[in-house]
Amino acid sequence: MDLNAIRILGLDPGLRRTGWGVIDVTGSRLAFVACGTILPPEQAPMGERLAHLHRELLGVIERFSPQEAAVEETFVNMNPSSTLKLGQARGVVLLAPAQMGLPVAEYAALLVKKSVVGAGRAEKAQVRMMIGILLPKATPETEDASDALAVAVTHAHHRGAAARARAAL
C-alpha cells in the first residue's frame, strides 16, 4: 500500500448477503484491494446471524486495515418485517467499523449509482460494468461485492464533503 493512500472499506448491508469491498485511494487514483460477500447461515436464529455478520466484518477490518468505511443506506420497502430485519443487519454493519475506530459515512443508493455510472437509476449490471472499468483488477463474484466496491468508490469521490459534515456535528 502506498504510504499516501487512504484505504476505504465499502459495505452493502443485508441480512442474507452483505457485500464488502476495499480500495486504496491516492489522489484521484483508485486501486482495487479485495472484495467479498458475507453469508450468515440462513436457518440460524436472528441473533446468531447478526453475530456471524459482526464477527466476519471485524475479520475483514482486521485483515485489510481500512482507515475509513462507507455504508450504503438501505431502501425501505413495503414489507415492514423485511425492513426491520434489514435495519438490524445495517446496525451491525455500522457498528463493526465504528467499534474499530473508523469514521463511517453513509450514502444513498441513488448517489452511489450516480457517482459510479452517472445515472441514479442505473441497473446493477451497469454498476458492475463500471466497477470493472474503474477498478480493472476487481473480481467481484456477487452483485453485493460489486455494490460494496461502488460504495467505496463513491466515498472516495465524496470523502471531503463527508469529513466536513462530520466536523460540523
Swiss-Prot record:
Q: Could you tell me the EC number(s) of this protein?
A: 3.1.21.10
Q: Which GO terms describe its cellular component?
A: cytoplasm; Holliday junction resolvase complex
Q: Which Pfam families match?
A: RuvC (PF02075)
Enumerate the residues binding Mg(2+) 1. Answer: D12, D144
How does the cofactor bind to this protein, according to its record?
Answer: Binds 2 Mg(2+) ion per subunit.
Which reaction does this chain catalyze?
A: Endonucleolytic cleavage at a junction such as a reciprocal single-stranded crossover between two homologous DNA duplexes (Holliday junction)
Please give the cofactor(s) recorded in the UniProt entry for this protein: Mg(2+)
Q: Which SUPFAM superfamilies match?
A: Ribonuclease H-like (SSF53098)
Instruction: Name its GO BP terms in alphabetical order.
Output: DNA recombination; DNA repair
Keywords assigned: Cytoplasm, DNA damage, DNA recombination, DNA repair, DNA-binding, Endonuclease, Hydrolase, Magnesium, Metal-binding, Nuclease
**Residues of the active site:** D12, E72, D144
Gene3D superfamilies to which the protein is assigned, alphabetical:
Ribonuclease H-like superfamily/Ribonuclease H
Q: Write out the annotated subcellular location.
A: Cytoplasm
Assign the protein's first listed, main location to one coarse class.
cytoplasm
Q: Which GO terms describe its molecular function?
A: crossover junction DNA endonuclease activity; DNA binding; magnesium ion binding
Record function comment: The RuvA-RuvB-RuvC complex processes Holliday junction (HJ) DNA during genetic recombination and DNA repair. Endonuclease that resolves HJ intermediates. Cleaves cruciform DNA by making single-stranded nicks across the HJ at symmetrical positions within the homologous arms, yielding a 5'-phosphate and a 3'-hydroxyl group; requires a central core of homology in the junction. The consensus cleavage sequence is 5'-(A/T)TT(C/G)-3'. Cleavage occurs on the 3'-side of the TT dinucleotide at the point of strand exchange.
Q: How does it assemble?
A: Homodimer which binds Holliday junction (HJ) DNA. The HJ becomes 2-fold symmetrical on binding to RuvC with unstacked arms; it has a different conformation from HJ DNA in complex with RuvA. In the full resolvosome a probable DNA-RuvA(4)-RuvB(12)-RuvC(2) complex forms which resolves the HJ.
State what protein this is by name.
Crossover junction endodeoxyribonuclease RuvC
Top-down, what is the taxonomic lineage of the species of origin?
A: Bacteria, Pseudomonadati, Pseudomonadota, Alphaproteobacteria, Hyphomicrobiales
Q: Which gene encodes it?
A: ruvC
